[in-house]
């Protein structure tokens, strides 16, 4: 029985990157032997065990054979006679198919270390094409390591395109697609993930709402990717990054229930959005509410941030109400970040955005400072409370504006 460290831990160690988790492969053992040693079995489809002390995963060496469509359509064979080289052969990329023994020696039958040194993401074997999830995984690794200079081997990219055209991507569950996407959003270069998916025709299958925006003459996706790239430098919040990409969806003028001719004139200049496409995206991928809410707010209100100082105070307060900023003030900063990334992409004047951002922050703090307690002490009840609160907030904003001028 021999135990080897494999996968991401070996790869990251060679790249001098942090190792967050360690996976092990066991050669020459049976499930019964693992149980006798105190390991706990956790794998359903193949023998994976948890170490009794470290709780790290130890998998018996295995081979896989394609039996049906999809990521789970494999028959696994795990036996003491399966070699380490056979186990490594089933892995996706050469850089993930390197093992290390207890002496620190590398076992690298597929030249993964060479590809690491040459900054190449390359498939291990032709069996790569059998698992559709690998399209997402390779795109994610491209996003994870783009800042180091990694690129995808051209033959590997061709295989990814074949998978995309085969229809097998449709067999992936929404949860699995989103899991890989969410990981990619946390990478240093999340825009590369979607760029790769576009290049290998996977975005048409997995994110059709985004892909359909592209035409031979114009592709708003490029703007979305640029906005995402800038947003990734401004924040590590994955929901903000995703909203920065998706703010390009469904451009359409949307009417507001505005309160005056001044507001109507201002809002005519703000292209807002149809929420149908974002609803489709959210439902199909089963996005968490945190993402859904920010996406909808971004599509509806991001444009207002760029002209926020031109809105009347009644409309500004309505904006605060609809975002529920009184209970969730962080939403304002999220919209400001997305707007900043978008304006930077379009070559906007940074000072202008900073002015609008500071204006809306100050206005919100002024409005939020109005005391509800004093209104209650004044004898107001039921509907009169909200009416009086709005009146006092308008009054406070008027006084603030007079002081500024």
Swiss-Prot record:
Cofactor(s) named in the record: Mg(2+)
- Is Magnesium one of the keywords UniProt gives this record? yes
- Sorted alphabetically, which keywords does the UniProt record give? ATP-binding, Magnesium, Metal-binding, Nucleotide-binding, Nucleotidyltransferase, RNA repair, RNA-binding, Transferase, tRNA processing
Instruction: Look up keyword Transferase and say if it applies.
Output: yes
Recorded hits in SUPFAM superfamilies, A to Z, give: Nucleotidyltransferase (SSF81301), Poly A polymerase C-terminal region-like (SSF81891)
What GO molecular function terms would the record report? ATP binding; CCA tRNA nucleotidyltransferase activity; magnesium ion binding; tRNA binding
**Record EC number:** 2.7.7.72
Domain named HD: residues: 220-326
Q: Which residues are recorded as binding Mg(2+)?
A: 21, 23
Q: What biological-process GO terms show up in the record? A: RNA repair; tRNA 3'-terminal CCA addition
Q: Which Pfam families match?
A: PolyA_pol, PolyA_pol_RNAbd
Q: Which reaction does it catalyse?
A: a tRNA precursor + 2 CTP + ATP = a tRNA with a 3' CCA end + 3 diphosphate; a tRNA with a 3' CCA end + 2 CTP + ATP = a tRNA with a 3' CCACCA end + 3 diphosphate
Q: Which residues bind CTP?
A: 8, 11, 91, 137, 140
Instruction: Please list the residues that bind ATP.
Output: 8, 11, 91, 137, 140
Highest taxon listed in the record's lineage:
Bacteria
Q: What PROSITE patterns does the annotation carry?
A: HD (PS51831)
**Annotated PANTHER family:** MULTIFUNCTIONAL CCA PROTEIN
Quote the record's miscellaneous comment. Answer: A single active site specifically recognizes both ATP and CTP and is responsible for their addition.
What function is annotated for this protein?
Answer: Catalyzes the addition and repair of the essential 3'-terminal CCA sequence in tRNAs without using a nucleic acid template. Adds these three nucleotides in the order of C, C, and A to the tRNA nucleotide-73, using CTP and ATP as substrates and producing inorganic pyrophosphate. tRNA 3'-terminal CCA addition is required both for tRNA processing and repair. Also involved in tRNA surveillance by mediating tandem CCA addition to generate a CCACCA at the 3' terminus of unstable tRNAs. While stable tRNAs receive only 3'-terminal CCA, unstable tRNAs are marked with CCACCA and rapidly degraded.
Task: Give the family from UniProt.
Answer: Belongs to the tRNA nucleotidyltransferase/poly(A) polymerase family. Bacterial CCA-adding enzyme type 2 subfamily.
HAMAP family xref list = CCA_bact_type2
Name of the molecule in the record: CCA-adding enzyme
What gene makes this protein?
Answer: cca
């Amino acid at each position: 029985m021999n135990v080897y460290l494999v996968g991401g831990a070996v790869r990251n160690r060679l790249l001098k990157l942090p190792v967050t988790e360690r996976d092990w492969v066991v050669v020459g053992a049976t499930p019964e032997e693992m149980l006798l040693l105190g390991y706990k079995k956790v794998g359903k489809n193949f023998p994976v065990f948890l170490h009794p002390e470290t709780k790290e995963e130890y998998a018996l060496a295995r081979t896989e054979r394609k039996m049906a469509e999809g990521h789970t359509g494999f028959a696994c064979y795990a036996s003491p006679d399966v070699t380490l080289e056979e186990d490594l052969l089933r892995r996706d990329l050469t850089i993930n198919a390197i093992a290390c023994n207890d002496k620190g020696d590398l076992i690298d039958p597929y030249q993964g270390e060479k590809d690491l040194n040459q900054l190449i993401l390359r498939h291990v074997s032709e069996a790569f094409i059998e698992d559709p999830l690998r399209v997402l995984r390779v795109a994610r690794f491209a996003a994870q390591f783009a800042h180091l200079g990694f690129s995808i081997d051209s033959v590997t990219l061709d295989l990814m395109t074949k998978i995309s055209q085969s229809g097998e991507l449709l067999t992936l569950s929404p949860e699995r697609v989103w899991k890989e996407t969410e990981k990619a959003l946390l990478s240093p270069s999340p825009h590369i993930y979607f760029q790769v998916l576009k290049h290998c025709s996977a975005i048409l299958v997995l994110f059709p709402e985004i892909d359909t925006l592209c035409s031979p003459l114009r592709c708003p996706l490029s703007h979305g990717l640029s906005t995402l790239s800038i947003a990734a430098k401004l924040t590590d919040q994955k929901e903000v990054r995703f909203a920065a990409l998706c703010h390009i969806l469904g451009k359409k003028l949307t009417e507001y229930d505005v309160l005056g001719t001044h507001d109507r004139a201002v809002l005519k200049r703000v292209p807002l959005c149809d929420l149908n496409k974002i609803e489709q995206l959210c439902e199909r991928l089963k996005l968490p509410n945190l993402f859904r809410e920010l996406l909808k707010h971004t599509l509806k209100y991001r444009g207002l941030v760029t002209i926020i100082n031109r809105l009347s105070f009644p409309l500004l307060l309505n904006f605060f109400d609809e975002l529920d900023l009184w209970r969730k003030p962080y939403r304002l900063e999220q919209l400001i970040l997305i707007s900043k990334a978008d304006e930077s992409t379009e070559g906007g004047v940074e000072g202008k955005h900073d002015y609008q951002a500071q204006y809306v922050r100050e206005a919100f703090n002024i409005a939020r400072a109005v005391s509800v307690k004093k209104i209650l002490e004044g004898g107001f009840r039921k509907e009169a409370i909200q009416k009086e609160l709005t009146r006092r907030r308008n009054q406070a904003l008027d006084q603030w504006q007079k002081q500024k001028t």
